Amino acid sequence: MNPATIITNFNNSQLQTPPTSPVSFDKYYTYYNIQLEQSTLMPQPSKIKNGDPFTWSDIQFIIKSNQLEIFARSRQQTIKYHKFKQWLKDNKLSINDYLLDYELHWKESELREQQHELVSDKEYSIDYPEDLIFHNPNDISILYNKFPYYFEPNVKHICIWSKLKIPVDKNSEVGDISVMTKKLINRYLEKTFVAKGISWDQIVWFKNWLSLQSVRSISHIHVILKDVDDKFVDELISGGSGEVLTLDDYRNLE
């Protein structure tokens, strides 16, 4: 059975993602024509997708079922990524150094975690606006993913970066984010994209849990867009932060 048909069991809110992933991906790698190849530049084998790129239905299934390990690059994209990793090695740069210096133009000292520990189980309090994700425009930067997965030409992959660390759900065994954090991200994307004419049918997003993160010290989410005009995305990136969350947004989602 086509795994993508399972997508009908998931809603657009992406709040019903399971906490863990399947133990074995062999059947998915076979179905999606993915092979594993080891490189001395990578700690784990690289996943190479042969044949056609992931379709939009494939992307929806992978993200909404939270089986993010399935994503892979084409061979050409993998070669390009390995060349980049070699360049980092030759220049004695970490991926974090590169992102801060060449892409985000942030100082490492600007990265921070929430400063106030709340007595309750709540992760956020409007009493401490500096600890609210996607609230302070200066905390946010939107960039194209320089090394996207193997998607169709009408699909764009952007990353939304945050100086403020997006908290991990303390009850998650795999380092996933909480339902409240997912609601906040949904609201931010609704204001940034949907309110400007982009349908939810054109948007999916995910945040890698800890075991999948190649960049751990700089929090970010991945947003995948289908059939969205280049000009819209370029203007969004040049604008910097998107439509940030207000204190009222936080109140309404509590």
Swiss-Prot record:
It comes from the Eukaryota. GO terms for cellular component: cytoplasm. GO terms for biological process: N-acetylglucosamine metabolic process. Its main location: cytoplasm. Keywords: Cytoplasm. The keyword Iron-sulfur does not apply. N-acetylglucosamine-induced protein which plays a role in the N-acetylglucosamine metabolic pathway. This is N-acetylglucosamine-induced protein 1. It comes from Candida albicans (strain SC5314 / ATCC MYA-2876).
